[in-house]
Amino acid sequence: MSKIKFGSQVYTWFMQGTGKGYDNKLDHMIKVAAEAGFTGIEPMVLEISESALGCGKYWLGDFCDPIKLKDSLDAHNMTLAGLALVCAWDGEEEAPNERAAADFTIDLLKHFPGAMLGTVTLPSGRTSDLQRRRLNVARNVNAVSRRATDAGLVCSYHPNSPPASLVRTQEDYDVVLSSLDPSVTGWTPDVGHIIRGGMDVIATLNKWQHLVNHIHYKDYSGNGPEPWSQMGTGKLDFHKITEWLVQRNYEGWIICEDEAHVAVDDPDGVTLQNGIWCKENLHPIVGL
């Protein structure tokens, strides 16, 4: 039986109206992901959801309630793969609102044994104090992860690649990933963000393989300000990346998200198509 599972990330739906299109509709996302053949889902805990976007609390809304979340997952035979906690974390210590979001996430995850606490940096600009702020990110991620580990959770840090992201290039990775405390957090390589940051995916995986405990898949076109393509149509060799995981006896989730333009208009359809693509192309590699 395969030790690798395939899940879906809610960001595919978040893009429509910057959260407004599918606000408080996590049950719908769970349903579609299940229909696509995914067995898990990874929602976000977006700290700025209410204050900056005018959406529901943490972009979970009613599903901040662990009972409501569990009921929706159970109705579709789905697992909570993890929660992606999104904060800036570039101050000297966690801001009060960031700490509140982190503590909420830790408390919610206590109801879902085995689900990952993902820490994701909210892009906050690269124009000033870059080195200090990168180190702040590592310090704050370590602090969150230490509290979560003390609560019995497993954690993983997820960098990204928008132009304003603090952790997007080889130099950024060298600073931040080497400053993570491996006793409390691993690393989630997002292969699309790695290539967008100008790095080779396999070389980067090799360099930091001791930290890999979660992974995100999305495809990359290299064209335009949002250089994404639907899974299987871009420049990434997902077969090779998946073989890399199998060869290293990776156990855990492959979380698929799609940021291609077509996904903005039709996140359901793209998720269904990507589920089929994974089943046909990647499931055989992992033994599903």
PLM regions with names:
Residues 1-39, 74, 100-103, 167-189, ...:
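Histidine-acidic metal/acid-base catalytic patches
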Residues 12-14, 45-47, 86-89, 121-126, ...:
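Active-site-proximal loop/turn and secondary-structure-junction residues that shape catalytic pockets
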Residues 56-59, 86-95, 192, 230-232:
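The substrate-binding groove and active-site-proximal loops of carbohydrate-active enzymes
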